[in-house]
Amino acid sequence: MKTKQQLRFLATILLTTILFVLAKTDTDPLEVLALQDLYKSLRNPEQLRGWRLEGGDPCGEAWLGISCSGSSIVDLQLRELKLLGSLGNQLQHLHNLKILDVSFNNLEGEIPFGLPPNATHINMAYNNLTQSIPFSLPLMTSLQSLNLSHNSLSGPLGNVFSGLQIKEMDLSFNNLTGDLPSSFGTLMNLTSLYLQNNRLTGSVIYLADLPLADLNIEDNQFSGIIPSHFQSIPHLWIWGNKFHVEPNYKPWKFPLDVRPLIQNDTGYPTTESSAIMNFPRPETQKVKKKKKGIGAGSTFLLVGGLALLGTFFALFAVRMNHRRAQNLAAIHRSNNSIAYSLPVSTGREYPVATEDNPQIKRFQPPPAPQLRHLPSPPVRIDKSARRKSFSATCQYPSFAKLFSAAELQLATNCFSEENLLGEGPLGSVYRAKLPDGQFAVVRNIPMSSLSLHEEEQFTEVLQTASKLRHPNIVTLLGFCIENGEHLLVYEYVGHLSLYNAMHDEVYKPLSWGLRLRIAIGVARALDYLHSSFCPPIAHSDLKATNILLDEELTPRIADCGLASLRPLTSNSVKLRASEIAIQNTGYIAPEHGQPGSSGTKSDTYALGVLLLELLTGRKAFDSSRPRGEQLLVKWASTRLHDRRSLEQMIDGGIAGTFSSRVASQYADIISLCTQAEKEFRPPVSEIVEALTALIQKQNKEASSSVADKTDPFSKSFCSTRTRFISSPTFSYLSS
């Protein structure tokens, strides 16, 4: 009897211990799914010991490269593992991750838009990542260090740095172009910035007031004046640019007694040719000595001898440089997967252990390889060579899938009426079910008989549209060009448009918090189109019906990058488009019809109309109203700056849920966007900043306002994890 009791006691202890261990080690299911998606995107590499495509417990089973705190993954170190593939699209579910290091691999594709929202250190250096910095970066308010150096990032830097507390950022050795965005000027904690070896242009004035201790902007195309504040930066590299220096420019007093801790310079340039044009070299010493006179003949012989000697050394230097370049190029060709350059990250360790996460270890940036990377020469495509046969030589988009006409006929049930979602200015839109079970949307664009040049133009539009990747833009999945058919395949977001949600009684009222979230999402998408491409992409048809709301009520703009296809459509489609344009008169800017009118400034105007629509609950154009009230902007423009009139024009469903100060600031933003003269409308990047400031003010008021307790979206803004939290799906149905 006593033995049985002892056995029961031991069994109880054993069971309790097992349950305790399981409770301690079971990893968050969302984080497990994120790692499984990453493993699949990395092509199931054998070197990731312990990783699985299904099941498993990363924390309990000690998957390679993973460190946990309890059941949360806090550290993901996959450095120098010769990994291939991409980073997937589920990293945003790693909510507790602090450190992400995937440097020194062979990763390809773009940087995911969804990054770990609470990460403090991200290192993706020495890979083959393309595109540019994702527009979700401002959501990472805890980020302290970002290293994206030695990749293939290209295009302009988006205006994506607002609200960050980052201290160290390295974007060097890429192919970034364009001017520095204004949001650089908001990085008031930034102490180390490395931008060398890109093709950045314009002024560096946004860096003037930053507390920088390390700044390297060498080998770019920066121009304009050099901020005087730069001479107080202890470690500074600015050579190889096009700065303008006046003839009477006062020489700087560089801190020569401080040696660089990092980077690839060992001192000041040894020749004037490597410094910026006309920029004074620092004088280390000034020594004056009396010299004896030299006769004219001696002077002639001396000058001639020096000239001959200089010519000899110049020829020798050219020969040696040519041979050195050939050797380095050969090394680069034979080791294409390795980036030969000196480190651009600091040589210091990052202290990232915190009270909340004591198990996080320090990580140190990679050591320096010994050779310097030589960029490959640009490849030029001779367009005349592909005019011989469009179908045989056309280069289709590499970011989208090529579907056959038979596949899409099967997916849409031969484009049946039951799958017809609607008619737009570019043709009919159908719902489709792809062979893998995924739902999609197929847009059938009837074209007139296209010339070879017009077919090439269509393909160029596809190339651009297929590259668009933004959380507030509907993604192009694929296309079909076959037997005269031109079909585009988009992801299926849902069939709820902002227009339906705003103006159909079954969906009203949308909460004020949700309306703000929609406004900032649409503005960010437009900013992405305008700031991340050269030339900028204008939507040219922004309206409530073109903004879809997904299951989480996140706004997604449709038909981005397709504006230039309208002249290529058939006459019947053009007629239908003109009828639709009459219905959308309220979004059309005053300069419409003038040369160059369909640009980014027209998008700014349409954004202002949308903001006004969200505030008032009225349609942009409503023929059922009295003549003086049909055009929303015309009716509201005189009321926006009168406090009593402004209060009266606010939608009754949200009246009283926010302060008059917030309403007044929102009205100011609308007024800026809807200026009659396009020159006075600000760029959308400034509208994003203004809306962000407005939401921050709303947050402060919501925390102490009783009225806002009825608005779950306003409360969601107060989260410390991310600036915007996905909204509950029931709120827009609230009665």
UniProtKB/Swiss-Prot annotation:
InterPro entries given in the database record: Kinase-like_dom_sf (IPR011009), Leu-rich_rpt (IPR001611), LRR_dom_sf (IPR032675), LRR_N_plant-typ (IPR013210), PRK1-6/SRF4-like (IPR046959), Prot_kinase_dom (IPR000719), Ser/Thr_kinase_AS (IPR008271)
The LRR repeat ranges on this chain: 78-94, 96-119, 120-140, 142-163, 165-187, 189-211, 212-232, 233-253
Molecular function terms from GO: ATP binding; identical protein binding; protein kinase activity
Listed transmembrane segments: 298-318
Localization: Membrane
Cytoplasmic compartment residues: 319-735
Domain of life (superkingdom): Eukaryota
Annotated glycan sites: N118, N128, N147, N175, N189, N264
Misc. remarks from the entry: Cannot functionally replace STRUBBELIG.
Similarity-based family: Belongs to the protein kinase superfamily. Ser/Thr protein kinase family.
Protein name per Swiss-Prot or TrEMBL: Protein STRUBBELIG-RECEPTOR FAMILY 2
Species of provenance: Arabidopsis thaliana (Mouse-ear cress)
Gene: SRF2
